[in-house]
């Protein structure tokens, strides 16, 4: 994932910062508790495509 792209991407819902999880290939929004997938190196920034993080899953 390109570092410059990570700097400008924000959560489409709350406009908050995203955190890159390399192993899971996801961008995490901590306040919304959503994980946006990265497919073929392209972040899919659609709310309908995001995975809701369960309460028990730790958000780094």
Curated annotation (Swiss-Prot):
Q: Which GO terms describe its cellular component?
A: cytosol
- Which Pfam family name is an example for this entry? Trm112p
- Could you say which protein family the record assigns here? Belongs to the UPF0434 family.
Q: Which PANTHER family match?
A: PROTEIN PREY, MITOCHONDRIAL (PTHR33505:SF4), ZGC:162634 (PTHR33505)
Query: HAMAP family per the record?
Result: UPF0434 (MF_01187)
Protein's name in the database: UPF0434 protein Mfla_2088
Query: Organism source for this protein?
Result: Methylobacillus flagellatus (strain ATCC 51484 / DSM 6875 / VKM B-1610 / KT)
Q: What is the lineage of its organism?
A: Bacteria, Pseudomonadati, Pseudomonadota, Betaproteobacteria, Nitrosomonadales
């Amino acid at each position: 994932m390109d570092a410059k792209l990570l700097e400008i991407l924000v959560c489409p819902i709350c406009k908050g910062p995203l955190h890159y999880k390399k192993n899971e290939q996801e961008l995490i929004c901590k306040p919304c508790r959503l994980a946006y997938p990265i497919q073929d190196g392209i972040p899919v920034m659609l709310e309908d495509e995001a995975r809701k993080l369960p309460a028990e899953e730790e958000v780094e």
